[in-house]
Structure formats: C-alpha cells, structure tokens
C-alpha cells in the first residue's frame, strides 16, 4: 500500500482527477483530497479482492475431481444353442424284400414248413416271373402237337401221313369226349401214354414202317 501511496503523490492533479473519474469518485477538492479518496477506494477494493481470493481458494480446494464414469455396455443375452440331437429326424427304412420272401425267411427262422405255393411265389418274385396258379388246371392237359411238323417228318422218312393225321384227330376227339363227360385221367397215365406213343413213333421212323 505504501508504494501505491507514493505513486499517487507522484501524480499530478489532472492525473489524479482522471483516476477518480475512472473509479467513479468526485474530482472536486485539492490534490490531497483526491489522493485520500483514491487511497480509501484502493484499500476497500484490496480487501474485497483478498476476500474473493480466499473464497475462491476454498471452493477450489473443496471441489475434488470427479471420477470419469465410462458408459457401461449392456450385456446381451446369450444366443440360444440349437440342440442338434433333438433336431435329428428319424428316418424309417422300409425293407424292399417282397412279402413272400419275408414269409419264407420267417418260416426258416422259426423252423416252420413253408408251403409249395409260397416257395413258388417267392421264387417268381425274386426272378421277376409272374407265377401262374396251378390250381384249376386239369391233369390230362397234353402239349399241342404241330401237325405240319409231323407231316414234314413223315414225308422225310417215307411214312404214311394220313395215318399220323388220323391218329392225332382221334386223340383230339378222345380228349374232347373225356372233357364232355367229365373224365379226368391221372397225370401218371398221361405220362405213360405219351412215352408209349413217342417210342412207337421213333421205332416207325427208324425202320421206315408206315
């Protein structure tokens, strides 16, 4: 404050008046009055500035640095893990074995005798052959005789063609008569007759007998 007072004394009256005007003080009076006014003004403001510095110092001491809060990222719910075992599809495998073959295998497994019809059906199904039912067929069915072939063979060996054709006609008539009257010959008898006729035919061809 002594230095400020010395400086004020060094100032001229005009300069003192300007200082008073700048601070809003009265400019009337002698030089000493102006110096006193300026000193009183400076002392007051010096105390105010000191008080302000003390207050500001206390506030700065009280204010502690706040910790910086980082934004917390929300945890996302875990994705659902697909249970692969539960999604496995059960595929039913159907067997491509025919019914007849399965019946045959089942019979073999349990030692059950298999009928002849089921065996034939299984064999036909295995090889892709359409099985023809044997029931309902008469046992006296004979293979059809080709008359043209018989005639050619008879002419080749010099046999009488008329006798062969007549014999075949007689056989046909006999067969029709049996069918008309419901006469059914056994398969054994049919086989014997066919063998006898074949032997006779071969013998006639060998010796050239008409």
UniProtKB/Swiss-Prot annotation:
<feature type="compositionally biased region" description="Polar residues">
    <location>
        <begin position="184"/>
        <end position="193"/>
    </location>
</feature>
<feature type="domain" description="SAP">
    <location>
        <begin position="8"/>
        <end position="42"/>
    </location>
</feature>
<keyword id="KW-0810">Translation regulation</keyword>
<feature type="compositionally biased region" description="Acidic residues">
    <location>
        <begin position="45"/>
        <end position="64"/>
    </location>
</feature>
<keyword id="KW-0694">RNA-binding</keyword>
<keyword id="KW-0805">Transcription regulation</keyword>
<keyword id="KW-0804">Transcription</keyword>
<comment type="similarity">
    <text>Belongs to the SAP domain-containing ribonucleoprotein family.</text>
</comment>
<dbReference type="GO" id="GO:0006417">
    <property type="term" value="P:regulation of translation"/>
</dbReference>
<keyword id="KW-0597">Phosphoprotein</keyword>
<keyword id="KW-0238">DNA-binding</keyword>
<dbReference type="GO" id="GO:0000122">
    <property type="term" value="P:negative regulation of transcription by RNA polymerase II"/>
</dbReference>
<comment type="function">
    <text>Binds both single-stranded and double-stranded DNA with higher affinity for the single-stranded form. Specifically binds to scaffold/matrix attachment region DNA. Also binds single-stranded RNA. Enhances RNA unwinding activity of DDX39A. May participate in important transcriptional or translational control of cell growth, metabolism and carcinogenesis. Component of the TREX complex which is thought to couple mRNA transcription, processing and nuclear export, and specifically associates with spliced mRNA and not with unspliced pre-mRNA.</text>
</comment>
<dbReference type="GO" id="GO:0003682">
    <property type="term" value="F:chromatin binding"/>
</dbReference>
<dbReference type="GO" id="GO:0016973">
    <property type="term" value="P:poly(A)+ mRNA export from nucleus"/>
</dbReference>
<keyword id="KW-0539">Nucleus</keyword>
<dbReference type="Pfam" id="PF02037">
    <property type="entry name" value="SAP"/>
</dbReference>
<keyword id="KW-0813">Transport</keyword>
<comment type="subunit">
    <text>Interacts with DDX39A. Interacts with FUS. Interacts (via the C-terminal domain) with DDX39B; the interaction is direct and facilitates RNA binding of DDX39B. Component of the transcription/export (TREX) complex at least composed of ALYREF/THOC4, DDX39B, SARNP/CIP29, CHTOP and the THO subcomplex; TREX seems to have dynamic structure involving ATP-dependent remodeling; in the complex interacts directly with DDX39B in a ATP-dependent manner which bridges it to ALYREF/THOC4.</text>
</comment>
<keyword id="KW-0007">Acetylation</keyword>
<feature type="region of interest" description="Disordered">
    <location>
        <begin position="45"/>
        <end position="87"/>
    </location>
</feature>
<feature type="modified residue" description="N6-acetyllysine">
    <location>
        <position position="142"/>
    </location>
</feature>
<feature type="modified residue" description="N6-acetyllysine">
    <location>
        <position position="10"/>
    </location>
</feature>
<feature type="compositionally biased region" description="Basic and acidic residues">
    <location>
        <begin position="65"/>
        <end position="87"/>
    </location>
</feature>
<dbReference type="GO" id="GO:0003723">
    <property type="term" value="F:RNA binding"/>
</dbReference>
<dbReference type="GO" id="GO:0016607">
    <property type="term" value="C:nuclear speck"/>
</dbReference>
<dbReference type="GO" id="GO:0005634">
    <property type="term" value="C:nucleus"/>
</dbReference>
<dbReference type="GO" id="GO:0006406">
    <property type="term" value="P:mRNA export from nucleus"/>
</dbReference>
<feature type="region of interest" description="Disordered">
    <location>
        <begin position="161"/>
        <end position="210"/>
    </location>
</feature>
<protein>
    <recommendedName>
        <fullName>SAP domain-containing ribonucleoprotein</fullName>
    </recommendedName>
</protein>
<dbReference type="InterPro" id="IPR052240">
    <property type="entry name" value="SAP_domain_ribonucleoprotein"/>
</dbReference>
<dbReference type="InterPro" id="IPR003034">
    <property type="entry name" value="SAP_dom"/>
</dbReference>
<dbReference type="GO" id="GO:0036464">
    <property type="term" value="C:cytoplasmic ribonucleoprotein granule"/>
</dbReference>
<keyword id="KW-0509">mRNA transport</keyword>
<dbReference type="GO" id="GO:0003677">
    <property type="term" value="F:DNA binding"/>
</dbReference>
<feature type="modified residue" description="N-acetylalanine">
    <location>
        <position position="2"/>
    </location>
</feature>
<dbReference type="GO" id="GO:0000346">
    <property type="term" value="C:transcription export complex"/>
</dbReference>
<dbReference type="InterPro" id="IPR036361">
    <property type="entry name" value="SAP_dom_sf"/>
</dbReference>
<feature type="modified residue" description="Phosphoserine">
    <location>
        <position position="163"/>
    </location>
</feature>
